[in-house]
């Protein structure tokens, strides 16, 4: 199939058919595409805004104004003044966990009222065979709804399929059909459809045991990538899961040796609608004489940065494991390593350990990463920068409290490498627009101030999620709309740079292009 010539102004983005069954292709085949009459924010070093961009053979062949002339054999897309940005790069999330959820997984990160959530689930039920589960597990929070709660049992009973919702914040809710299904398998569910205590882990474990197959995993993996394509993400850097050989009760656990299989299958079939970069999480214990049983095997038997433009391995993270000895092994192997920090003591220790290793084995060229950093004073930024370490920030829409960081404004004035990540998939949201909302306004999804004076402008926020993330992906040909770069772009449904703050949360893609392929379109005729 091929793209067509014009975008219909005012088209509504449809999320009803969120996860379709895998079709023959997940993308429209690459063709020469000329985008004209737009406001194309290139995010190049000069922050140029141009009206035209030509994609040929999957890469930008021309970018500017009046560049096309009488070019032949090109499909022209009239943007009619729409805003275009480079494809969003989420430089640290857990998309692979989302792609391995049981049931007919249905994201709800784009709805903000209980009524809209129920409408979404009811629409989804039309695609789901009778008696099969609709699930929403992970990237959803009570905070995102104006009611500040999850749907209750009576509300979910409007959906004529079993429903299971497990939120990053707000607990777990089911409807009567889902409640009866789990209770028949020995899982205790409250009269209100809530699950608490040990029963919560047992519920998820039971769903995984009974509902997951290679085919359902593949369906969900494709659906997850398609969903976030509709939100403008063109590159995901996945940062792993906690290892579990058997179906696990924990939301952040999976078999880390097989969980990539559905994504690899999509890659083999050329159905990936987004680029994937895969890091490997390890947790070998830091003992006096560690054997590093899993990390040593990974470093010995895997290749870093191996693959193609659609799927490629990366490094070790979001945990390196093995303490200082693990860091030494990673440095000796020449791999990238990443750990997260949740407080000042944690990030201080991470930097101290890296200084110890760097004194023995230089790491300054390995682009090591520390993520999250809610507390990160200038002195630590100086020390991290001296080691060649970059920091990933985001991770905030569901947080509460005053001045809980990260210190975005300080970082923008510092030489240290910085980029955007959501960390979404299990404990927070992936939706970039919810994360951007917090970075720009300084408020969480409940409208509570959490950043003090550390919030950023819209231009700065977009830069973190596009051009700045080249360094973290270790690729120079994504993240900006420039000649020679991969043809990744997003046509937005509204102008990101001028809409009211509250509308930021509702931003969507009308058209998402990856490598010249149309991976999402709404309104192309």
Please give the residue ranges for each predicted region.
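Boundary at the C-terminal end of the N-terminal hydrophobic targeting segment
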Residues: 16, 20-22
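His/Asp/Glu-enriched, well-ordered alpha-helical/loop segment
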Residues: 331, 336, 340, 345-368, ...
């Amino acid at each position: 199939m091929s793209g067509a010539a014009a975008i219909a102004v005012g088209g509504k983005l449809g999320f009803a058919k969120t996860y379709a069954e895998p079709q023959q292709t997940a993308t429209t085949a690459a063709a020469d595409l000329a985008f004209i009459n737009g406001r194309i924010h290139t995010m190049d070093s000069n922050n140029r805004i141009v009206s035209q961009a030509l994609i040929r053979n999957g890469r930008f062949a021309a970018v500017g104004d009046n560049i096309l002339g009488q070019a032949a054999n090109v499909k022209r897309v009239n943007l009619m003044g729409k805003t275009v940005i480079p494809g969003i790069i989420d430089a640290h999330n857990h998309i692979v966990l989302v792609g391995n959820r049981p049931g007919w997984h249905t994201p709800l990160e784009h709805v903000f009222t209980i009524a809209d959530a129920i409408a979404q689930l009811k629409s989804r039920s039309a695609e789901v065979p009778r008696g099969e589960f609709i699930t929403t597990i992970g990237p959803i929070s009570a905070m995102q709804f104006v009611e500040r709660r999850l749907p209750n049992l009576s509300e979910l009973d409007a959906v004529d399929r079993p429903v299971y919702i497990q939120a990053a914040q707000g607990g777990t809710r089911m409807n009567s059909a889902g409640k009866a299904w789990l209770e028949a398998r020995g899982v205790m569910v409250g009269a209100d459809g809530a699950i608490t205590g040990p029963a919560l882990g047992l519920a998820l474990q039971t769903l995984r045991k009974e509902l997951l197959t290679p085919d359902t995993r593949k369906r969900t993996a494709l659906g997850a990538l398609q969903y976030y394509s509709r939100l403008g993400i063109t590159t995901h850097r996945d940062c792993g899961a906690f290892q579990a050989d058997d179906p696990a009760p924990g939301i952040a656990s999976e078999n880390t040796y097989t969980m990539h299989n559905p994504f690899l299958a999509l890659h083999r079939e050329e159905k990936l609608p987004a680029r994937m970069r895969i890091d490997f999480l390890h947790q070998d214990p830091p003992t006096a004489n560690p054997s590093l049983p899993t990390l040593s095997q990974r470093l010995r038997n895997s290749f870093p940065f191996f693959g193609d433009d659609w799927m490629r391995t990366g490094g070790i993270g979001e945990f390196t494991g093995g303490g200082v000895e693990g860091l030494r092994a990673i440095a000796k192997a020449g791999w990238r390593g990443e750990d997260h920090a949740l407080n000042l003591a944690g990030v201080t220790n991470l930097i101290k350990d890296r200084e110890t290793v760097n004194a023995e084995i230089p790491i300054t060229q390995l682009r090591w990463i520390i993520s999250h950093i809610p507390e990160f004073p200038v002195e630590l930024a100086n020390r991290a920068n001296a080691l060649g370490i970059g920091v990933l920030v985001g991770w905030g829409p569901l947080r509460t409290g005053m001045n809980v960081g990260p210190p975005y404004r300080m970082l923008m004035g510092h030489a240290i490498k910085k980029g955007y990540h959501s960390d979404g998939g299990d404990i927070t949201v992936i939706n970039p627009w919810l994360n951007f909302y917090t970075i720009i306004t300084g408020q969480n999804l409940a409208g509570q101030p959490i950043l003090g004076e550390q919030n950023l402008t819209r231009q700065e926020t977009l830069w973190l999620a596009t051009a700045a993330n080249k360094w973290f992906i270790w690729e120079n040909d994504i993240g900006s709309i420039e000649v020679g770069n991969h043809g990744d772009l997003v046509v937005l449904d509204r102008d990101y740079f001028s809409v009211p703050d509250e509308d930021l949360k509702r931003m969507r893609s009308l058209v998402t292009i990856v490598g010249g392929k149309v991976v999402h379109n709404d309104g192309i005729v």
